[in-house]
Curated annotation (Swiss-Prot):
Transmembrane segments: none
Subunit structure: Part of the ribosomal stalk of the 50S ribosomal subunit. Interacts with L10 and the large rRNA to form the base of the stalk. L10 forms an elongated spine to which L12 dimers bind in a sequential fashion forming a multimeric L10(L12)X complex.
Superkingdom of source: Bacteria
A single cellular component GO annotation: cytosolic large ribosomal subunit
InterPro entries for the chain: Ribosomal_uL11 (IPR000911), Ribosomal_uL11_bac-typ (IPR006519), Ribosomal_uL11_C (IPR020783), Ribosomal_uL11_C_sf (IPR036769), Ribosomal_uL11_CS (IPR020785), Ribosomal_uL11_N (IPR020784), Ribosomal_uL11_N_sf (IPR036796)
PTM note: One or more lysine residues are methylated.
CDD domains to which the protein is assigned, alphabetical: Ribosomal_L11
Name of the protein this chain belongs to: Large ribosomal subunit protein uL11
SMART domains: RL11
Any one of the GO BP annotations: translation
GN (gene name): rplK
Chain segments annotated as coiled-coil in the UniProt record: none
Job of this protein: Forms part of the ribosomal stalk which helps the ribosome interact with GTP-bound translation factors.
Length: 141
């Protein structure tokens, strides 16, 4: 018989740097999960993606065991990295803060493809372009 799911926790953590300190500690500690075990497994699974923010969905079961699924980094993080920015525009429609090329958009779309609700690379590129525009990043050819 399948284990009963008690909770699903969504976090965004830096790859390879999960520690029992907040936000991991409070989110998982109150559900009785062994924090050090989670941190070791997460850090091992994301060691090759150092420096990136990785969304993770942790499923906690009744017997205090857990499983987790890592996703691709958020599009906003990848766009900021491509445009060499620290943050997006405070006024996205009026003030552009950076530029990315269509080739960079295509690279990001290929990375994000498995997490996006898109059937082909063109649709994924349009989604990423929309994210860029909402951050005040201009898309150039």
């Amino acid at each position: 018989m399948a284990k009963k799911v008690v909770a699903q926790v969504r976090l965004q953590l830096e790859a390879g740097k999960a520690t029992p300190a907040p936000p991991v500690g409070p989110a998982l500690g109150q559900r009785g999960v062994n924090l050090m075990e989670f941190c070791k497994k997460f850090n091992a699974a994301t060691a090759d993606k150092a420096g990136m923010i990785i969304p993770v969905i942790i499923t906690v079961y009744e017997d205090r065991s857990f499983t987790f699924i890592t996703k691709t980094p958020p599009a906003s993080f990848l766009l900021k990295k491509a445009a060499k920015l620290n943050s997006g525009s405070q006024e996205p429609k009026r003030k552009m803060v950076g530029k990315v090329t269509r080739d960079q958009i295509k690279e990001i779309a290929e990375i994000k493809m498995k997490d996006l609700n898109a059937n082909d690379i063109e649709a994924a590129m349009k989604i990423i372009e929309g994210t860029a525009k909402s951050m005040g990043i201009e898309v150039v050819d």
